């Protein structure tokens, strides 16, 4: 049974009713979709406020692009991009997630008021596991390869995430703090990406909440022919809805308003189904 509560520092998310939207806030010059758009602190705060108004309950702040081929930024640069934004958002009552793999940033973000650590390397960097365990924050672990078109990507991802969860538990992390991300768009073929999405039920067998991060990804662009990431909103919303229908409870997205509206319609249909079933049994 998948856990019903995700504990993230001072925030507890009830996952029984509807998915939680995590709005993406990249404070980078080179992120694949929105790099350079929110680098200045006032711009970042304004965009976060807009996303909150549109339905985002979590703001995911990233100071280093994780797109394939991106250049690693120095520690000091990531720190200067991320920590002031985290402090300002936390002061305004936001639930802040920080997309980082560096233990130094994890610890400073926790001190600055972050509630979630979102690590595409699943806390494998030296010191990251200990940094995560020393906090009470929510933790997201992600699978990203290595790329192998011949492997069973679903089972590979499931086993990898299971091992990383075991490492966190052994370090003293409570299971209610952990969420899984199968890593759509990371180290997978086009077909494997959609196998991971279709096999959401396999990951739910872990008992952990599932995070889906399909927003504006290149795989969606290849299917739709949309080379510009900004033109992939419709495909991104479709992917988010498919993930939600398959049990994903955290949706990491750029297009918050569109995703929120689509989820509202999906919920209305679900409630109509319940009423129809109830009448049929009466």
Question: Can you annotate each of these PLM segments?
Answer:
Residues 1-11:
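Short coil-to-helix leader/linker segments, especially the first N-terminal amphipathic alpha-helix
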Residues 8-10, 16, 33-47, 66-95, ...:
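Active-site-adjacent loop and "lid" segments of alpha/beta metabolic enzymes
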Residues 18-20:
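A short, charged/proline- and glycine-enriched loop
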Residues 25:
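Active-site-adjacent mobile loop/cap segments within catalytic or ligand-binding domains
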Residues 29:
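Catalytic-pocket segment enriched in acidic/His residues
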Residues 46-62, 246:
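Catalytic domains of carbohydrate-active enzymes, especially glycoside hydrolases
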Residues 174-177:
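Short acidic capping loops at alpha-helix termini that bridge into adjacent secondary structure
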């Amino acid at each position: 049974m998948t856990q019903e509560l995700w504990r993230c520092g001072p925030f507890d998310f009830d996952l029984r009713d509807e998915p939680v939207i995590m709005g993406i806030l990249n404070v980078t010059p080179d992120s694949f979709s929105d790099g350079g758009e929110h680098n200045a602190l006032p711009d970042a705060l304004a965009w976060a406020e807009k996303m909150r108004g549109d339905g985002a309950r979590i703001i995911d702040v990233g100071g280093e692009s994780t797109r394939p081929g991106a250049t690693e930024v120095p520690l000091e640069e990531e720190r200067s991009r991320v920590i002031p934004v985290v402090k300002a958002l936390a002061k305004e009552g936001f639930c802040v997630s920080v997309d980082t793999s560096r233990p130094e940033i994890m610890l400073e973000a926790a001190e600055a008021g972050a509630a979630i650590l979102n690590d595409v390397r699943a806390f494998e960097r030296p010191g990251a596991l200990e940094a995560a365990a020393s906090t009470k924050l929510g933790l997201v672990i992600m699978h990203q390869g290595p790329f192998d078109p011949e492997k069973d990507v679903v089972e590979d991802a499931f086993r990898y995430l299971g091992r990383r969860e075991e490492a966190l538990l052994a370090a003293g992390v409570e299971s209610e703090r952990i969420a899984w991300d199968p890593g759509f768009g990371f180290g997978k073929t086009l077909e494997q990406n959609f196998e991971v999405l279709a096999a959401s039920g396999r990951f739910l067998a872990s008992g952990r909440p599932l995070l889906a991060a399909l927003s504006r990804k290149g795989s969606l662009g290849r299917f739709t022919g949309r080379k510009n990431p900004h033109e992939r909103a419709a495909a991104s919303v479709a992917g988010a809805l498919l993930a939600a229908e398959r049990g994903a409870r955290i949706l990491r997205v750029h297009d918050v308003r569109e995703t929120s509206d689509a989820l509202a319609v999906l919920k209305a249909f679900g409630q109509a189904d319940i009423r129809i079933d109830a009448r049929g049994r009466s």
